[in-house]
A protein has these predicted regions:
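A basic- and aromatic-enriched beta-loop-alpha substructure that forms the phosphate/nucleotide-
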Residues: 61-140
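A structural signal for short, well-ordered beta-strand segments and their strand-loop junctions
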Residues: 28-31, 100, 170-172, 177
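Helical scaffold of the NTase/Pol beta-like nucleotidyltransferase catalytic core
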Residues: 1-30
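Soluble or luminal CAZymes and related metallo-dependent hydrolases
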Residues: 6-11, 79, 83, 113, ...
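Acidic, carboxylate-rich catalytic segments that either coordinate divalent cations
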Residues: 239-263
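Conserved NTP-donor binding/palm subdomain of two-metal-ion nucleotidyltransferases/polymerases, i.e.
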Residues: 14, 24, 89, 119, ...
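Conserved nucleotidyltransferase catalytic core and NTase-mimicking acidic/glycine-rich helix/loop elements
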Residues: 116-246
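Catalytic metal-binding acidic patch
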Residues: 33-74
Length: 263
């Protein structure tokens, strides 16, 4: 089954099934992970992430209610969603994963106004220091687990490399990093030889299966290790001061989209 059939038929159908089964209204549904980054393999899963509002009754319980949905379909479509209030609380805390959601280049559905409204607020709530900690943790995790010799899954090396390059973007520009890996490489890698080696790995990844092992070029490997060590030092020197923001605008957005969808 080709990707266009997934995007245009299967995924919209699954989103409708989620709304019916869980009695919710989806505000935003996007692709996350390797397909959004642009280094999916031939057999990569579909990782959908979504934001939703519940039926009116959900909002009138004195007990805390479950505010997440996770559902795996048998055709390798994996969905995970957050209720709008949870999503906004994480947005307020500068959650890097949520910022990736709202900047995903693959949007399956967006409620009119929601995506633009949330993006107008991101300058107040995005904190590069928190993002640096997050992506530094990602590449250190993949380094500790997988990078002991040059032969390793391409997927893991690209995860590792992406974490490093996001830290470089954050250091150089201090803004929300691009989701597409090629955009990140173009903006942060000036050495043409290294850039060409990354492009070659990316091509191999797209042509291979998810867990294929391929040798990583030693020059690229050494370059990445050097960058990783440098940004480890940058992160260790950070002294983040995240000031508390008032919730008025987020509360208003929450009220507006809940009210709009439960009338």
């Amino acid at each position: 089954m080709d990707s266009e059939q997934y995007k245009n038929v299967i995924i919209p159908s699954h989103l409708h099934e989620i709304e019916e089964q869980y009695k919710v209204k989806i505000l935003l549904a996007v692709e996350s992970g390797s397909r959004a980054w642009g280094f999916e393999s031939k057999d990569s899963d579909w990782d959908l992430r979504f934001v939703y509002v519940q039926e009116p009754e959900w909002y009138f319980h004195i007990e805390e209610q479950k505010d997440t949905i996770e559902h795996m379909f048998p055709d390798e479509v994996d969905l995970a969603g957050w209720e709008l209030g949870k999503a906004l609380r994480l947005f307020k805390r500068s959650n890097p994963s949520f910022f990736e959601w709202i900047h995903s280049p693959i949007v399956y559905y967006a409620d009119e106004g929601f995506l633009s409204d949330i993006k107008t607020l991101e300058g107040r709530y995005f904190h590069k220091e928190k993002a640096m900690y997050h992506y530094n943790h990602i590449y250190k995790k993949h380094n500790d687990r997988y990078i002991e010799e040059f032969g390793l899954p391409l997927k893991r090396f690209l995860y590792y490399l992406r974490g490093i390059l996001v830290c470089k973007w954050l250091t150089d520009f201090g803004t929300v990093p691009p989701v597409r890996f090629t955009e990140l490489v173009d903006a942060t890698v000036s050495d043409k030889t290294i850039k060409d080696k990354i492009a070659h790995l990316l091509k191999l990844k797209k042509q291979s299966n998810e867990h294929n092992q391929e040798p990583v070029d030693k020059e690229l490997f050494d370059w990445a290790q050097g960058q990783a060590e440098y940004y480890n030092g940058v992160v260790e020197s950070l002294r983040p001061e995240i000031k508390a923001e008032k919730d008025d605008e987020l509360n208003a957005l929450y009220y507006r989209f809940v009210h709009k969808n439960i009338e």
